[in-house]
Amino acid sequence: MLELIAISEVNDALAEMVAFFRVELRSYKGLVSKPNVDVGREEMEEYLAAGFPVFAALVDDQYAGYVVCRVDSEVVWVESIFVKEEFRRHGVASALHSKAEEIAASYGDDTVYNYVHPNNHHMIEFLRKRGYTVLNLIEIRKPYKDEKLTQTITVGEHEFDY
């Protein structure tokens, strides 16, 4: 059975999921890394200290995923959403994302803003199926010193290093 719970403090299972989320994000940049549970715990503690709404999904009392929302001027952003591999394609992400939409609705809004890596094809497809088809903003920055950029992404007529 799937259950969503509000998170008020970090436990080991949640810290581990955050660590694996960071590993997955790095993989979109072609980087291989190992999960760092201490860093995952610290990241989640920062979200909670900042008052971000955080929810975890439990499936048969096992932690299956989580969503972190940021509310800024009554606009809801999904800061991160993660589902463990073995629980994917079972409605967990949909339930978590619906919770973010529920928060947005409580402010009178009918959309959630989502941060997505441009080559995170699974998340983009997930969002498209939920009706999220509008590209809102892109984030552009200078390369970091010694950063190795290995891909390019085209948006409209423009090509960007990634």
Feature locations, PLM:
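A short beta-loop-alpha structural element at the N-terminal edge
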Residues: M1-A19
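A conserved beta-turn-beta hairpin within the catalytic core of GNAT-like acetyltransferases
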Residues: R70-E79, R88, L135
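Conserved GNAT acetyl-CoA-binding A-motif
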Residues: A104-V116
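Glycine-rich acetyl-CoA-binding "A-motif" of GNAT/NAT acetyltransferases
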Residues: Q62-G65, H122, V134
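Conserved acetyl-CoA-binding loop-helix of GNAT-fold acetyltransferases
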Residues: V83, R89-E102, H121, E125-K129
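Conserved beta-strand-loop-alpha-helix junction that forms the acyl-donor binding cleft
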Residues: N114-M123, K145
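Conserved GNAT-fold acetyl-CoA-binding loop/helix
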Residues: L2-I5, R22-M44
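A short helix-loop-beta-strand connector motif used in the catalytic cores of GNAT acetyltransferases and
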Residues: E42-A56, G65, W77
